[in-house]
Amino acid sequence: MVSPDTIRTAIGVVGNGTALVLFLSPVPTFIRIWKKGSVEQYSAVPYVATLLNCMMWVLYGLPAVHPHSMLVITINGTGMAIELTYIALFLAFSLGAVRRRVLLLLAAEVAFVAAVAALVLNLAHTHERRSMIVGILCVLFGTGMYAAPLSVMKMVIQTKSVEYMPLFLSLASLVNGICWTAYALIRFDLYITIPNGLGVMFAVAQLILYAIYYKSTQQIIEARKRKEADHVAMTDVVVDSAKNNPSSGAAAAAANGRY
């Protein structure tokens, strides 16, 4: 008979895989930044915030804080490395005040996590108390991360289009939330259950919106394509007309020259 711990580990491994997919989802954005040599209007805040979330979960998973949480450490340690890579690329292609702001946020995060670690490890003397303090902070940051798609969901409702809410990422978020909620329930862990349970709710809400607005999205895309095709056709007509009647173009140029 398979033990609960074995099932929990298997679910955690799947959860690590889906979480890795989510961590890697911004790669196309950074490929664009690399090619253009500029961060344009992109913000570093999501990556700095995700880094803080990962650092706090690594602290939570330490044997001295919450034993038997190796899978929590591995995926969030990997997430830290990925987010640091994103931030390094952002810094490489940003200038002046933007770069200084990111560096300041980064320094503040490192100082905050270091202070929490020092205080918890020195002033809290049991695993239960350490887990509670760090866990509450993780719930706060984790809930904030999972609530981030609310802005996208608002845009979907306003525009009646799911064009900028990829189905694949919504499905990955759902599977990830389910895996980590199940992982936390097998050996009950309130602090992992809360943010991931909320993550499941937000992912389900995204999928419901996708089902509601899928048809209207296709109509919007088709209307845009027709408009672009009409614009191209009209441009071609104007160009052909100018070629076939060059005197009118010369007359127009002369008229413009008089004014």
Curated annotation (Swiss-Prot):
GO MF, one annotated term: sugar transmembrane transporter activity
Topology of the protein relative to the lipid bilayer: Multi-pass membrane protein
GO cellular component annotations of the record: membrane; plasma membrane
Residue intervals annotated with topology Extracellular: 1-10, 66-77, 123-131, 187-191
InterPro entries: SWEET, SWEET_rpt
Coiled coil: none
Transmembrane parts of this sequence: 11-31, 45-65, 78-98, 102-122, 132-152, 166-186, 192-212
Any one biological process term the GO annotation gives: carbohydrate transport
Domain MtN3/slv: residue ranges: 10-94, 133-217
Glycosylation sites: 76
Family of this protein: Belongs to the SWEET sugar transporter family.
Function description: Mediates both low-affinity uptake and efflux of sugar across the plasma membrane.
Quaternary organization: Forms homooligomers and/or heterooligomers.
Annotated protein name in UniProt: Bidirectional sugar transporter SWEET4
Name of the gene encoding the protein in the UniProt record: SWEET4
